[in-house]
Amino acid sequence: MATGAATENQWLKGRVKAVTSGDCLVITALTHNRAGPPPEKTITLSSLMAPKMARRGGIDEPFAWESREFLRKLCIGKEVAFKVDYKVEAIAGREFGSVYLGNENLAKLVVQNGWAKVRRPGQQNQDKVSPYIAELEQLEEQAQQEGFGRWSKVPGAAEASIRNLPPSAVGDSGNFDAMGLLAASKGKPMEGIVEQVRDGSTIRVYLLPEFQFVQVFVAGLQAPSMGRRQSTQEAVVDPDVTATSNGDASAETRGPLTTAQRLAASAASSVEVSSDPFAMEAKYFTELRVLNRDVRIVLEGVDKFNNLIGSVYYSDGDTVKDLGLELVENGLAKYVEWSANMLDEEAKKKLKATELQCKKNRVKMWANYVPPASNSKAIHDQNFTGKVVEVVSGDCLVVADDSIPFGSPMAERRVCLSSIRSPKMGNPRREEKPAPYAREAKEFLRQKLIGMEVIVQMEYSRKISPGDGVTTSGAGDRVMDFGSVFLPSPTKGDTAVAAAATPGANIAELIISRGLGTVVRHRDFEERSNHYDALLAAEARAIAGKKNIHSAKDSPALHIADLTVASAKKAKDFLPSLQRINQISAVVEYVLSGHRFKLYIPKESCSIAFAFSGVRCPGRGEPYSEEAIALMRRKIMQRDVEIVVENVDRTGTFLGSMWEKNSKTNAGTYLLEAGLAKMQTGFGADRIPEAHILEMAERSAKNQKLKIWENYVEGEEVVNGSSKVETRQKETLKVVVTEVLGGGRFYVQTVGDQKVASIQNQLAALSLKDAPIIGSFNPKKGDIVLAQFSLDNSWNRAMIVNGPRGAVQSPEEEFEVFYIDYGNQEIVPYSAIRPVDPSVSSAPGLAQLCRLAYIKVPGKEEDFGRDAGEYLHTVTLESGKEFRAVVEERDTSGGKVKGQGTGTELVVTLIAVDDEISVNAAMLQEGIARMEKRRRWEPKDKQAALDALEKFQDEARKSRTGIWEYGDIQSDDEDNVPVRKPGRG
């Protein structure tokens, strides 16, 4: 559109943005090349004079409202062609012109329908006239004859056309009752016509049919500010001056403006000081959609300044649209919590989600938006099923993953419930008491979940620092994994497997609905529960019901005497009171070892250390000790049990028998049947309840040669698995060492294995192209890929050990990979990783983890650990020799291979083909290792091997070599009797 400098009589095209009276329009350009809203013109129809609407304190001229409504409904929002016929400089250069809607001349239509009269030019303004003046005069005469519009001949029609306006419509808003209007109309759609757009989110509107003139702020959002304004000394230009003078500067003086007209003219009576970016664009966006349009207003509330807050709906063809949502969706307004709280939850959620998407896409006002730093990252594709082993608190569980072998250190996974926070349990070691309702929240989950199969959907991880108030075991940051936990859905007709795969009740929602936790209010870009809205709804119900933490009641006081940290004398003093009770109900709080536990006795309000009478597991550090602990955690951890107390030992540990409450099973049989414990009846089996059941369980394990009985021979004295030096042929492998770790551990490949050659041939045949497109390949933890080794650029099979959470964003993102055929591990960029064909990835890794048998090698961080590592590296990896690896035992406690140092470990004697002594003996001789401590339960063949190795250690000790430089060294902690520590609560 041409600017104000355009010449007259030039036809232009535009769109009608506003109709201010029955003869005046605001027209905007259809296209423009500058930033911001398009230019616009105010055009008064030449030679016409429409009736005047009411001013401040006044009333309408007859038919004024109908005149404006005729023109408004005829052309608002439509494309028109127009030209300027003349200007009147005396009234600020106001432009008068001819406007065509399609083939229709708007001036002719207005006059023809009787909504304006034709103004004859004065003596001084003979040139200020419409080019269609003759036709207009003829049409006016016809309208008068027919009685159309203002020329109506119906008696009383003129008086009836005058609106009965309330004070707010004529400039007197002092007595306007906003609260009364809200009370009468809240939530009900009200018809209205928008008279002015103050800014993108504030409109002034006539509410029909009473014509209340009100200002409405769009609920839930705020558009950029139009800036502060300063009053000027210039006279206000009457926007409707043409309704009287139509170019005649000598016309009579007009009365005062109404509130609506005064506000419409405010742009001329003030000077813009400053405005926010996109303020003009937001205002124009709203003007283009609702200015002078029919809208529906739904009042939602009133603020402290008596301003009305509401939702604004307008029609776009056959569709009804929400102005607020449209503004936010187009990046022209921001979400505002305080007024959004007046909306219903669904509308509030939609508005918030729309803003978040705009921020992510950096639309308009969010173009330079930088999200705040977040310590949470999404977790993808890590759903699993498992059994709940432990309830740590009201918002944290330990779940045993069904897919990971029993006994593996990685089987138990700690899962924090997403987006909720329960009262903290405190820390007895720091003398921190549980918060109110913390015990109730934990107990609720314990009774609901312990031993139950659950479905876990991991959602995000969060880095927690000590300053965040979360108790951590170390001083550094800790990464916690959050997810949603569900009980399986009890669907009829489903198999157990199908039911287990269908999520049922959300545990977090159960906690929140009972008032035992609160929902975390996340920041915009923080990861959150996928069921966040359900959690908020549950919290609202709990607050309304004043449940637990939302009530005014204090939580029940509970004082527990912890005898596990008390003196042995106090425990002995307590013994008679426990012996008097036949069977004591208790809860297993913690598994201290395979046969020793911390129990809570509700009836006595005390915690005790408890051990089985006559049943003993391997000691700490001995074979199968960790497996025994893992078994008892799954079987009785946090379960309800019954105990009989027989005695107390010198450390204050109570001795007796225990039964799992539901099954009435003697808990000692779990260990004995699994071959993880043995009977000790030196003081008489007759004193042990159900001793015959325990003996049967032990006999069954012996017959099956389970665990500690694997080398048992009937009739011979057994010391943890063997009775004499075995004559069985031990497995011997011919190997080469491929990687050396610390502590006497290393990886080998079997020499002559056809799998090695097959894998190498398959890799050589691969054609590796360019790096995959970002986003098309997102390897996750545990996946097998091809990775390029940094030292020789060769491509090898590798397992992802660690990587970025979520989708890959850059080729430089780093992944930690474990080369499954060689045993080494390194960090490589995404560009050095390729997907691998299943035919190549399906074969097991060729690298086998081994450990030198019968000796203890210092770790890399210990004294002489570096020397030991370098020596082992020199005699194995650097020498390139082949070795015989005699397998003494297999350690399966490492579970599945998850990275370097995990998986099944072969405990071997390593002998070079051309050497006389083993590497094990050589390291003892060099003083960079020492022998394992002899234990009573060791097999006789192991004791014989230790006898043979002892001379090499004695030689190093006598010559003060290596670790023996300063004489005998103290045994490590494993060799000493462990000091009893306070049990964890």
UniProtKB/Swiss-Prot annotation:
<dbReference type="GO" id="GO:0000932">
    <property type="term" value="C:P-body"/>
</dbReference>
<feature type="domain" description="TNase-like 2">
    <location>
        <begin position="188"/>
        <end position="368"/>
    </location>
</feature>
<feature type="domain" description="Tudor">
    <location>
        <begin position="778"/>
        <end position="843"/>
    </location>
</feature>
<feature type="domain" description="TNase-like 1">
    <location>
        <begin position="10"/>
        <end position="153"/>
    </location>
</feature>
<dbReference type="GO" id="GO:0005635">
    <property type="term" value="C:nuclear envelope"/>
</dbReference>
<dbReference type="GO" id="GO:0009651">
    <property type="term" value="P:response to salt stress"/>
</dbReference>
<keyword id="KW-0256">Endoplasmic reticulum</keyword>
<feature type="region of interest" description="Disordered">
    <location>
        <begin position="963"/>
        <end position="985"/>
    </location>
</feature>
<dbReference type="GO" id="GO:0003723">
    <property type="term" value="F:RNA binding"/>
</dbReference>
<dbReference type="GO" id="GO:0048471">
    <property type="term" value="C:perinuclear region of cytoplasm"/>
</dbReference>
<feature type="modified residue" description="Phosphothreonine">
    <location>
        <position position="961"/>
    </location>
</feature>
<keyword id="KW-0007">Acetylation</keyword>
<feature type="domain" description="TNase-like 3">
    <location>
        <begin position="382"/>
        <end position="552"/>
    </location>
</feature>
<dbReference type="GO" id="GO:0006397">
    <property type="term" value="P:mRNA processing"/>
</dbReference>
<dbReference type="GO" id="GO:0005829">
    <property type="term" value="C:cytosol"/>
</dbReference>
<feature type="modified residue" description="Phosphoserine">
    <location>
        <position position="971"/>
    </location>
</feature>
<dbReference type="InterPro" id="IPR016071">
    <property type="entry name" value="Staphylococal_nuclease_OB-fold"/>
</dbReference>
<feature type="modified residue" description="N-acetylalanine">
    <location>
        <position position="2"/>
    </location>
</feature>
<dbReference type="GO" id="GO:0031047">
    <property type="term" value="P:regulatory ncRNA-mediated gene silencing"/>
</dbReference>
<dbReference type="GO" id="GO:0010372">
    <property type="term" value="P:positive regulation of gibberellin biosynthetic process"/>
</dbReference>
<dbReference type="GO" id="GO:0034605">
    <property type="term" value="P:cellular response to heat"/>
</dbReference>
<dbReference type="GO" id="GO:0005737">
    <property type="term" value="C:cytoplasm"/>
</dbReference>
<comment type="function">
    <text>Cytoprotective ribonuclease (RNase) required for resistance to abiotic stresses, acting as a positive regulator of mRNA decapping during stress. Essential for the integrity and function of cytoplasmic messenger ribonucleoprotein (mRNP) complexes called stress granules (SGs) and processing bodies (PBs), sites of post-transcriptional gene regulation during stress (e.g. salt and heat). Involved in gibberellic acid (GA) biosynthesis and seed germination. Essential for stress tolerance, probably by regulating mRNAs entering the secretory pathway.</text>
</comment>
<keyword id="KW-0378">Hydrolase</keyword>
<feature type="domain" description="TNase-like 4">
    <location>
        <begin position="582"/>
        <end position="711"/>
    </location>
</feature>
<dbReference type="GO" id="GO:0009506">
    <property type="term" value="C:plasmodesma"/>
</dbReference>
<keyword id="KW-0540">Nuclease</keyword>
<dbReference type="GO" id="GO:0046686">
    <property type="term" value="P:response to cadmium ion"/>
</dbReference>
<dbReference type="GO" id="GO:0010494">
    <property type="term" value="C:cytoplasmic stress granule"/>
</dbReference>
<dbReference type="Pfam" id="PF00567">
    <property type="entry name" value="TUDOR"/>
</dbReference>
<keyword id="KW-0597">Phosphoprotein</keyword>
<protein>
    <recommendedName>
        <fullName>Ribonuclease TUDOR 2</fullName>
        <ecNumber>3.1.-.-</ecNumber>
    </recommendedName>
</protein>
<dbReference type="GO" id="GO:0005783">
    <property type="term" value="C:endoplasmic reticulum"/>
</dbReference>
<dbReference type="InterPro" id="IPR047395">
    <property type="entry name" value="Tudor_AtTudor1-like"/>
</dbReference>
<dbReference type="GO" id="GO:0003729">
    <property type="term" value="F:mRNA binding"/>
</dbReference>
<dbReference type="InterPro" id="IPR002999">
    <property type="entry name" value="Tudor"/>
</dbReference>
<dbReference type="InterPro" id="IPR035437">
    <property type="entry name" value="SNase_OB-fold_sf"/>
</dbReference>
<dbReference type="GO" id="GO:0009536">
    <property type="term" value="C:plastid"/>
</dbReference>
<feature type="region of interest" description="Disordered">
    <location>
        <begin position="228"/>
        <end position="255"/>
    </location>
</feature>
<dbReference type="GO" id="GO:0009845">
    <property type="term" value="P:seed germination"/>
</dbReference>
<keyword id="KW-0677">Repeat</keyword>
<dbReference type="GO" id="GO:0009686">
    <property type="term" value="P:gibberellin biosynthetic process"/>
</dbReference>
